[in-house]
Swiss-Prot record:
Parts of the chain that traverse the membrane: 22-42, 52-72, 96-116, 132-152, 173-193, 211-231, 253-273
SUPFAM superfamilies: Cytochrome c oxidase subunit III-like
Oligomer and partners: Component of the cytochrome c oxidase (complex IV, CIV), a multisubunit enzyme composed of a catalytic core of 3 subunits and several supernumerary subunits. The complex exists as a monomer or a dimer and forms supercomplexes (SCs) in the inner mitochondrial membrane with ubiquinol-cytochrome c oxidoreductase (cytochrome b-c1 complex, complex III, CIII).
Any one GO molecular-function label of the UniProt entry: cytochrome-c oxidase activity
EC number: 7.1.1.9
Role noted for this protein: Component of the cytochrome c oxidase, the last enzyme in the mitochondrial electron transport chain which drives oxidative phosphorylation. The respiratory chain contains 3 multisubunit complexes succinate dehydrogenase (complex II, CII), ubiquinol-cytochrome c oxidoreductase (cytochrome b-c1 complex, complex III, CIII) and cytochrome c oxidase (complex IV, CIV), that cooperate to transfer electrons derived from NADH and succinate to molecular oxygen, creating an electrochemical gradient over the inner membrane that drives transmembrane transport and the ATP synthase.
Protein name (database record): Cytochrome c oxidase subunit 3
InterPro entries: Cyt_c/ubiquinol_Oxase_su3, Cyt_c_oxase_su3_dom, Cyt_c_oxidase-like_su3, Cyt_c_oxidase_su3-like_sf, Cyt_c_oxidase_su3_a-hlx
GO biological process annotation, one example: mitochondrial electron transport, cytochrome c to oxygen
Length: 275
């Protein structure tokens, strides 16, 4: 009897068996509300709840953020306070992040494929030239160049923060991460200003659609990466990270460097060569 009782106190495998959680299902419903509301809003359909169509989009966004925040709270508790993230679990998470980034790479390859398919062999409908006739392109050496400087600077500061965490330099880690967040927010603001002042829209043929889809989807990745790093920043302030256990921060850094590299390709091909 005593032997059976003692065995229940130990885990005989290194994997983390996740307990039942409502957050994946609730996040799925929240995303369904958000995407459905966005489609209705973009196509001018009335809000079934009354009021502006943007209201339903806001509700979907708020519920999505709330569900994900509660989900991430449980993940942080499991990894930081309960010790469920063993070395093998951390290796699995790292592999999962790497595979996710690889899938994102192939997605952006398809975006660049669409761009070069249209730009390298423009049809007669486009005036047999690129940019198409009537399109006033954005000067790549104004806001796009500033955004490039901001994003590359953020890559440098987040790398500095990473090395500071490894070396136990708490002040340097906090400063580097804070500067990264500032650069990221400035990038998003500049991107919004660029969109507002652009001389074309997403409806202006293949040029407008490929431009706004590629840069806009990258902008969404920047916002996601900013939130990812912001979570790591607040965990850093709460003393959750150590010099040997900061997997969430490392994952956010890998994601951010991926965003940096994609932007370089966008700047060179879409903004510079494409204009």
């Amino acid at each position: 009897m005593n032997t059976q009782l003692s065995r229940t106190q130990f885990q005989f495998q290194p994997f983390h068996l996740v307990t039942p959680s409502p957050w994946p299902l609730l996040t799925s419903f929240a995303l369904l509300i958000l995407t459905s509301a966005a489609v209705m809003y973009f196509n001018g359909y009335a809000n079934p709840l009354g009021g502006s169509g943007a209201l339903l989009v806001g509700i979907g966004l708020a519920t999505t953020v709330a569900a994900m925040a509660l989900w991430f709270r449980d993940v942080v508790a499991e990894g930081t306070f309960l010790g469920d993230h063993t070395i093998l679990v951390q290796k699995g998470i790292t592999m999962g992040v790497a595979l996710f980034i690889i899938s994102e790479v192939f997605f952006f390859i398809s975006v660049f494929w669409a761009f070069f398919h249209s730009s390298l062999s423009p049809t007669v409908e486009l005036g047999a030239q690129w940019p198409p006739v009537g399109i006033a392109t954005i000067n790549p050496f104004e806001l796009p160049l500033l955004n490039t400087i901001l994003l590359l600077s953020s890559g440098a500061t987040v790398t500095y923060a990473h090395h500071s965490v490894i070396e136990g330099n708490r002040r340097g880690a906090i400063l580097g991460t804070l500067m990264t967040l500032i650069f990221a927010v400035l990038f998003t603001i500049c991107q919004g200003i660029e969109y507002l002042n652009a001389g074309f829209t997403i409806a202006d043929g293949v040029f407008g659609s490929t431009f706004f889809f590629s840069t806009g989807f990258h902008g969404v990745h920047v916002i996601i990466g900013t939130l990812f790093i912001a979570v790591a920043f607040f965990r850093m302030l709460s003393y959750h990270l150590t010099d040997h256990h900061h997997l969430g921060f490392e994952a956010s850094i890998l994601y951010w460097h991926f965003v940096d590299v994609v932007w370089l390709f966008l700047f060179i091909s879409v903004y510079w060569w494409g204009s």
